[in-house]
Design a protein with these regions (language model features):
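Tryptophan-anchored aromatic micro-motifs
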Residues: 23-60, 85, 120-132
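Contiguous, well-ordered beta-strand patches that form the walls/edges
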Residues: 71-116
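Catalytic-core signature of thiol
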Residues: 147-461
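Cleavable N-terminal signal peptides of Sec/SRP-targeted secreted and luminal proteins
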Residues: 3-23
């Protein structure tokens, strides 16, 4: 047994003796749990521009309208009037439907910290496709029936420092393979278990299951042949279209940083580098109803839906603090919007390597989520892949860490390998000046399974 495996077993024993209560988590619902016929109940319209469009699990809806909608395979939505639209699962926690000129988004219901009720949607947000006629709605699935599902989590008060960032773990990683190099980081010393979890996505970004990247089609295989073997938006005709690396610190706001970075880069591309914005992740952490602050969130809902519904503000309007708080963004701050947000491939579960390459090359960097293992924290350089896949226990909670893919490349030494070029949000003192390479073409850690893109709307300043 390797030194790292022994170390992980020892860590497991400590954790198993320590953890005794469950953490508060969000729902854990699958595609088949959501697919079927639903009835959406809509409340009264909110005055446009008002700040009272708050739809939460405690919202009491005075039902004014009901609409029946069938959600079918793979992403088809049909309302009771015969209008045809589309829908997508949003990770394992909710869904969005666009049909009949209206949009509906809601989180699935969860109760008692462990039970997901996937046949119900918490009071969520409904509006027409232009962002007007804003209402709260709630959903009830009619058929087929869905059973309760249970899941577990860690105690959110746990204060245990795992042996991540230890010399022993780093030595074991470097001995086991030659594709990438691990190192220890002084800035990680003294961080708690909760700190590491937030850095890697936050407790509310945990996913008990994730989609696999779909097989590459014959048409996509021909598209691959038209794309360059390497590409990097930092180096296009002597221009850099990617904003600087930032540091999220010990706040689970990676989803906000990845979303802001995608909007920043795509706006630079759209304006031929004449507009270089730095958008405010703190506005997301404090103000977004579609995420959970420093406990996590997802780029589809922030770089996409929030940016379209509410807009993004400049960093100077709400400078980054790295912790939760009351929304302090001034209403006078200018808003920058996006449109046409979607999962790469069209819906959740339709992504793959070639679809990502095509989107990146033709439209700009994409925000992705991938599963973070403990060894990733020690990455220094090279083509990352998870080490010791079959060890008996992984002491680090698997979270969905959001980052920005800006390009791709290939290496021939020490062995041939293909990789993605990825911008992280842990500062320039981590990895390769804040970037990392990760194996491409094999859905390493799920990085090719749920990429997101959105198109910024150009503003004349």
């Amino acid at each position: 047994m390797s030194g790292l495996a022994k170390l992980l077993i020892n860590v497991a024993a400590v954790i198993l003796l320590t953890v005794s209560v469950q953490a508060d988590t969000l729902a854990n619902c699958t595609y088949e749990d959501i697919r079927g016929t639903w009835v959406f109940e809509l409340g009264p319209s909110h005055k446009e521009g008002s700040k009272d469009w708050e739809c939460t699990s405690t919202t009491q809806i005075s039902v004014q309208y009901k609409v029946k909608i069938t959600l079918d395979y793979p992403d088809i939505a049909i309302d009771e009037f015969g209008n045809k639209g589309f829908w997508t699962l949003i990770y394992n926690q909710g869904f969005e439907v666009v049909v009949g000129g209206s949009k509906y988004f809601g989180f699935s219901v969860f109760k008692d910290k462990t039970v997901s009720i996937c046949s119900k949607a918490n009071p969520g947000w409904a509006h027409d496709v232009l962002g007007h006629d804003r209402r709260c709605f709630q959903g009830q699935k009619q058929s087929p029936a869905v059973k309760f599902m249970k899941k577990t989590g860690r105690d959110s008060s746990l204060r245990f420092e795992p042996s991540i960032n230890s010399e022993e773990m780093v030595a074991s990683i470097n001995k086991a393979q030659k594709s990438w190099t691990a190192t220890t980081y002084p800035q990680f010393q003294g961080l708690t278990h909760d700190d590491f979890v937030r850095m890697a996505g936050g407790k509310r970004s945990r996913m008990l299951s994730r989609p696999r990247s779909v097989p590459i089609t014959e048409k996509q295989d021909s598209v691959r042949g038209t794309l360059p073997s390497s590409f990097d938006w930092r180096k296009v005709n002597g221009q850099n279209y990617v904003s600087p690396v930032r540091n999220q610190a010990a706040c689970g706001s990676c989803y906000a940083f990845a979303s802001m970075a995608m909007a920043e880069s795509r706006l630079q591309i759209l304006t031929n580098n004449t507009q270089k914005h730095v958008f405010a992740p703190q506005d997301i952490v404090e103000c977004s109803p579609y995420s959970q602050g420093c406990d996590g969130g997802f780029p589809y809902l922030i770089g996409g839906k929030y940016a379209e519904d509410f807009g993004l503000v400049e960093e100077k309007c709400n400078p980054y603090k790295g912790h939760d708080g009351k929304c302090s963004t001034e209403s006078s701050c200018a808003r920058n919007y996006v449109t046409d947000y979607k999962y790469i491939g069209g819906y959740y579960g339709a992504c793959n390597e070639v679809a990502m390459m095509e989107a990146i090359y033709n439209r700009g960097p994409v925000a992705v989520g991938f599963m973070v293992y403990g060894d990733f924290m020690s990455y220094k350089s090279g083509v990352y892949h998870h080490v010791f896949e079959n060890h008996p226990f992984e002491p680090f909670e698997l979270t969905n860490h959001a980052v920005l893919v800006v390009g791709w490349g290939e290496v021939t030494s020490p062995s041939p390998d293909r990789y993605w070029i990825v911008k992280n949000s842990w500062g320039t003192g981590w990895g390769m000046d804040g970037y990392f390479w990760i194996r491409r073409g094999s859905d390493e850690c799920g990085i090719e399974s749920m990429a997101v893109e959105a198109t910024p709307i150009f503003r004349f300043n």
